[in-house]
Amino acid sequence: MATRIRLQRHGRKSYAFYSIVIADSRAPRDGKFTEKIGTYNPNTNPATVDLNFERALHWVLVGAQPSDTVRNILSREGVYMKKHLLGGVAKGAFGEAEAEAKFEAWKNNKQSGLSALKAKEEEAKKAEAKARLEAEKKVNEVKAKALAEKKAAEEAAKAAAEAPAEEAAPAEEAATEAAAE
């Protein structure tokens, strides 16, 4: 039986997530499968992978061929690194304890790189939010200044309209007094 490790699609339109399954290569994509070894959700950032490491390693060791995407997932999770190290142990290049130490060192290095990437993304988000807030403050200051100028112009126009009316009122009173005399 030609066994494949591949993705089985689930989810709604434009929002797919996948099960990582062991299936016969002749079976339909979403059809019959031998074993489910994990899930893959590419919609999150970074993509979420939940994988049964031991079963994935077992199937790779017995010769199951992964699809391109699954090969990348298994490589990122360390299944292929572990297979490589177990091959070195089988050849007698080094011991199993040394292989475990190398694998743990590789895994820790991978985790530190991932955490640094997440921290960098978080810092970029904070900087972007701060820049957006500063830009909004500047726009609000310009709007407030324009509004204050408009109110000052209205007050000046209102004061100018009242001043001639006040000057005209005493002149009218004087004219009425002169006519009365």
UniProtKB/Swiss-Prot annotation:
Domain of life, per lineage: Bacteria
UniProt KW keywords: Ribonucleoprotein, Ribosomal protein
SUPFAM superfamilies (UniProt xref): Ribosomal protein S16 (SSF54565)
GO MF term (any one): structural constituent of ribosome
Start and end residues of each stretch annotated as Disordered: 150-181
Biased composition (Low complexity): 158-181
InterPro entries the record matches: Ribosomal_bS16, Ribosomal_bS16_dom_sf
Membrane-spanning intervals of the chain: none
Name of this protein: Small ribosomal subunit protein bS16
Taxonomic path: Bacteria, Pseudomonadati, Bacteroidota, Bacteroidia, Bacteroidales
Gene that specifies this protein: rpsP
